[in-house]
Design a protein with these regions (language model features):
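Metal-dependent amide/peptide-bond hydrolase catalytic core
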Residues: 2-3, 34, 53, 178-179, ...
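Acidic/His- and Gly-rich active-site-bordering loop/insert found
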Residues: 2-108, 129-134, 385
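Short beta-strand segments
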Residues: 80-81, 141-143, 166-169, 189-191, ...
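Phosphate-handling active-site elements
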Residues: 91, 101-103, 123-139, 217-227, ...
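Glycine/serine-rich anion-binding loops at beta->alpha junctions
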Residues: 103-119, 196
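Acidic/histidine-rich catalytic neighborhood of metal-dependent amide-processing enzymes
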Residues: 113-185, 386-387
Length: 387
């Protein structure tokens, strides 16, 4: 039986009220333990016969796995959503206080991505209560650390016997994502020579050299990335994130560091971006005596490109068309999701979600009516794919 609006609000409210900030981003973040236990308790109380397992990927960092077994002989479909959130320093008083205004529900993680976990939970309950006889298994995986370095989905991707996956992230409900960008977090470092501020003939200013690198990186963004966008994923992501350098006012800085996020399109690798940065170093060294630069990769995530997904896509398109009254828009994203990790493990994967907004910002919101459509789409897809 599909959930009512009041049941949806009750479930999402309870999940929003649980602090599950990823400690990878915020060192004293609460982590995912309490929300994973809440999901396990909710499913146990629902008495639907699901096999429930809490798997600690790292101490205090669990994945919650719930399997509704079919009659046998069918595939296993995994619904993947994440339990962790970013921090809420910008709205400490209201982030964990769910609020309803018409069709919109507000709160940290209500869209990104506790809505995905809740959708999986409600679909498990609905399928069990409907008495539908499915040959295959539905596995709902509420994973840790997507907002960090995705240790949860990296662990899940090694889980045996998953034949296809639907990753849920907030997005327009009529979007069916079949590819998206990868990204890298990179430190761009320039090295100078420390010297007394009154001895320019002895010092080499690492900050001045880094400023030249920044200028040329933005030129690369304007003249290459912006002018040559991907038809599916938009322009390649680039932005500066952090900058540091120097020791005091009176000394030439011997080191300066720029932290950037930079994207890759399907068919590209982060090594392509590193080569572009190193080419900038070569150009600068031709005119700046003493210039020395290096690149240090902090995190490298490959792009996502769905493969072997035709049967799953057929089921999703049929369900989305039925629920929405029109075919979905098959497209890409300029963001990154755990779909890339599932597909990289050889699991045919697609990405859907429900309308929301203000992700990683105050007053994050979710459309309740669109969320309920997502639940129906998931249930119909599971019935079709697993039968």
């Amino acid at each position: 039986m599909p959930a009512t609006r009041s049941e949806v609000i009750e479930l999402l409210s309870a999940m929003v009220e649980i602090d599950s900030v990823t400690p990878w981003l915020i060192p004293d973040g609460a982590g995912e333990g309490r929300v994973a236990q809440y999901i396990a308790d909710w499913l146990t109380a629902a008495d639907i016969g699901a096999e429930i397992e809490i798997v600690e990927v790292e101490p205090g960092r669990p994945n919650l796995l719930a399997r509704l077994r079919g009659t046998g002989g069918g595939p296993t479909l995994c619904v993947n959503a994440h339990t962790d959130t970013v921090g809420f320093a910008n709205w400490p008083d209201t982030a964990l206080v769910p609020r309803i205004d018409g069709d919109l529900m507000y709160g940290l993680g209500v869209a990104d991505d506790k809505s995905g976990c809740a959708a999986g939970m409600l679909v498990l309950r609905s399928l069990a209560s409907s008495g539908a006889r499915l040959r295959g298994d539905l596995l709902v995986a509420c994973v840790a650390d997507e907002e960090g370095i995705s240790i949860g989905s990296e662990h899940l991707a090694r889980y045996p016997g998953i034949d296809a996956a639907i990753v849920i992230e907030p997005q327009p409900t009529d979007m069916l994502v079949v590819e998206h960008q990868g990204f890298g977090w990179i430190d761009v470092i320039t090295h100078g020579v420390a010297a007394h501020g009154s001895a320019p003939e002895e010092g080499v200013d690492a900050i001045v050299h880094l400023a030249e690198v920044i200028s040329r990186l933005h030129r690369l963004d304007r003249e290459v990335f912006t002018r040559n966008p991907s038809a599916m994923n938009g322009r390649t992501v680039f932005h500066t994130g952090t900058v540091s350098g120097g020791t005091d006012y009176a000394t030439y800085p011997n080191r300066a560091t720029l932290g950037i996020e930079i994207g890759t399109q399907p068919g590209e690798h982060l090594n392509d971006r590193v080569a572009e940065i190193e080419a900038i170093f070569t150009e600068i060294a031709e005119t700046e005596p003493g210039f020395r630069g290096e690149v240090s990769v902090r995190l490298d995530r490959d792009p996502f490109l769905a493969q072997g997904h035709e049967r799953l896509q057929e089921a999703l398109v049929a369900s989305m068309t039925d629920v929405l009254g029109r075919p979905p828009t098959v497209t890409g994203l300029n963001a990154w999701t755990d779909a890339a990790l599932m597909q990289a493990a050889g699991i045919p994967t697609l990405l859907i979600g429900a309308n929301g907004g203000n992700f990683h910002a105050p007053d994050e919101w979710l459309s309740l009516s669109e969320f309920m459509k997502l639940c129906t789409i998931l249930e119909q897809t599971a019935v079709s794919f697993l039968s």
